[in-house]
Structure formats: C-alpha cells, structure tokens
Regions:
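Catalytic toxin/effector domains delivered as secreted proteins or via bacterial secretion systems
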Residues: 1-107
Length: 107
C-alpha cells in the first residue's frame, strides 16, 4: 500500500499519504521521473508544506520500514531552501526507531 506519514508541528498532527495529489505536486514534472517519485512521496509532500509555510524544521514519522527512498534523499535537498531540515523517523524491521535528516541546499 501507500506510505503514510504524520507531521507533528505546533501541537497539530497532519496526516499525509504518498500519491500524486498533495502539496508535493508543485514539483511534479512528467519529464523527470526521479523528481516525480520524490514529489509524490510523503517526504515530498512534507517538504512542500515546509516551503509553502516557511517552516525551517519539521519532523515526519513514516510507516515504511525501509525509511526514505534514495530518490527522496537525492532530490529533496535541492527543493528545500538552504538550512531547512526535514527529520524523517520510521520503525525498522527490528522495531528500532530510526531517523535521518533531509537538509535543504536549494535557493
């Protein structure tokens, strides 16, 4: 099924689902498959929310036991402004909470 994600920000919980429809569609480009994959994943939707609302740091917890995919890790730093940080948390196959950061280096 689709990856689900929950953002906790300012006492609000926002639920996201991977797919074409969502905040990440601002980056959707049919000619760039790697960008599209990142734009349609929950991490891409979260990154788009950060950009649209000028949120410099945010945490999303996802239900994918493998963590963020390679395309998200490669494509999203260019789409987040310099210094923005998206923390991605997940539970791995051993039940351990893991976390990685997607750090913005865009303009």
């Amino acid at each position: 099924g689709s990856t689900q994600g929950i953002i906790d920000y300012n006492g609000m919980s926002i639920s996201l689902t991977s797919g074409r429809n969502g905040p990440g569609e601002i980056w959707y480009d049919p000619t760039r498959p790697a960008v599209n994959q990142a734009a349609t994943h929950v991490e891409g939707h979260a990154a788009a929310i950060m950009v649209e609302n000028q949120i410099r740091e945010m945490t999303i917890t996802i239900n994918n036991r493998n963590g963020p995919c390679g395309n998200c890790m490669r494509q999203l730093p260019e789409r987040l402004p310099q210094g923005y940080v998206l923390n991605v948390r997940w539970l791995d196959n051993k039940g351990t909470i893991r976390m990685t950061q997607i750090v913005g280096r865009g303009r």
